Curated annotation (Swiss-Prot):
Pathway: Cofactor biosynthesis; biotin biosynthesis. Substrate binds at residues 23, 135, 348. Its cofactor is pyridoxal 5'-phosphate. It catalyses: 6-carboxyhexanoyl-[ACP] + L-alanine + H(+) = (8S)-8-amino-7-oxononanoate + holo-[ACP] + CO2. This is 8-amino-7-oxononanoate synthase. GO terms for molecular function: 8-amino-7-oxononanoate synthase activity; pyridoxal phosphate binding. The keyword Kinase does not apply. Pfam families: Aminotran_1_2. It comes from Vibrio cholerae serotype O1 (strain ATCC 39315 / El Tor Inaba N16961). PANTHER family: 8-AMINO-7-OXONONANOATE SYNTHASE, CLASS II AMINOTRANSFERASE/8-AMINO-7-OXONONANOATE SYNTHASE.
Length: 384
């Protein structure tokens, strides 16, 4: 029987290799502001989600070091035992005050936060409605939950309206900014549509810190307040982890019944301390968003006439190429020129929509953007 495991694993790996869809870890020596180093060669890094340039910021590094000196290296237990400290409580309070919620529940990753929410909240009689392009963590959780899951066409509020049933206990889930396409959900229209008919949950992993007043995210920018808001700390915060923002009752429910929370070791308190500092930097250092906006405008101006360009209002700039081979080839050619841009292929994106996923951060310069555009133009002209 054990040979079946081996055979099945080998078959799956061979099929992925044959389809040229194998993904491999990229061993990096270190990263710096807007750059990364691999085997002693420096590349411009246009594949990072560090939108505000905080991941290598000296002020944030110092905050983590201060947290280590004060709280030690790890939490030592789950939050429900002895793993919850004053550093965690301060982070929760900061998030609630900033984003306007009664409770914030911390998780080790956005993936675990999304899975915990859908596994815990949904029951067999419930209806889960998800945008077709939602993140894999949401889709997988929806498929494994006891609820009936239906997907509405991407950003299509009319299709969502057709799927909503007033008699059902419904949860509508969308991302604020979609991670592979860089477009924004029509949150105001969705919120109006679901009002008093369903709960709304927004995963704002790629909007928090970047959009809205004081970086409060997609929902604040759209003027809405969903019942559940998920924010993650691996993008604009420059760190790792996630939080679920909700009312007091939902927060208590998650604390009691969300297994990802109850049975996982709490994030290190030094990390929570650094995250609180990152949240305050995001709110107070508006120059980072202003600088990012200037760089996004520069990118659009330099690239709009190059084949494959897709306009977005966010730091995520998909460059659609279609085939996986085309995306891999373009990524390789850019790397040869010292520019690191990842090729995104199925199953991460639908078949026929392979792309370069270019991300702009506040740590870049306009000179670096111009260099990227010149090389993109060269690669696209060569391929056509």
């Amino acid at each position: 029987m054990t040979l079946r495991f081996k055979s099945r694993i080998e078959q799956a790996l061979n099929e992925r290799e044959h389809s040229r869809l194998t993904r491999r870890l990229q061993l990096l020596d270190r990263s710096a502001q807007g750059e990364l180093i691999q085997q002693d060669r420096t590349y411009l890094n246009f594949s990072s989600n560090d939108y505000l340039g905080l991941a290598n910021d000296a002020e944030l590094v110092q905050a983590w070091q201060t947290g280590l000196a004060r709280f030690g290296a790890g939490s030592g237990a789950s939050p429900m035992v002895t793993g919850f400290s004053s550093a965690h409580a301060e982070l929760e309070h900061e998030l609630c005050h900033w984003l306007g919620y009664e409770r914030a529940v911390l998780f080790s990753s956005g993936f675990s936060a999304n899975q915990a929410l859908l596994f815990t909240l949904l029951e067999k009689e419930d209806l889960l409605l998800q945008d077709k392009l939602n993140h894999a963590s949401l889709m997988e959780a929806g498929m494994l939950s006891p609820a009936t899951m239906k997907r509405f066409k991407h950003n299509d509020t009319e299709h969502l309206r057709q799927l909503l049933h007033e008699q059902s206990n419904s949860l509508v889930v969308t991302e604020g900014v979609f991670s592979m396409d860089g477009d924004c959900a029509p949150l105001a229209q969705i919120a109006t549509l679901v009002k008093q008919r369903a709960w709304l949950m927004v995963d704002d992993a790629h909007g928090i810190g970047v959009l809205g007043e004081d970086g409060a995210g997609s929902c604040q920018a759209a003027g809405i307040h969903p019942e559940i808001l998920v924010v993650t700390f691996g993008k604009a915060f420059g760190l790792a982890g996630a939080a679920v923002l909700c009312d007091a009752h939902v927060g208590d429910y998650l604390t009691q019944f969300a297994r990802h929370h109850v049975y996982s070791t709490a994030m290190p308190p030094a990390q929570a301390h650094a995250l609180t500092h990152a949240a305050r930097m995001i709110q107070s250092q508006s120059w980072r968003r202003e600088q990012l906006a200037e760089l996004l405008a520069c990118f659009d101006e330099q690239c709009r006439n190059i084949p494959g360009f897709v306009a977005t209002q966010t730091p995520i700039k998909p460059w659609l190429l279609g085939s996986s081979d085309s995306a891999l080839s373009a990524s390789h050619e850019l790397k040869q020129q010292g520019i690191w841009v990842s090729a995104i292929r199925p199953p991460t994106v639908p078949v026929g929509s392979a792309r370069l996923r270019i991300t702009i951060t506040a740590a870049h310069t306009q000179a670096q953007i111009r260099r990227l555009s010149e090389q993109l133009k060269h690669v696209m002209e060569k391929d056509t």
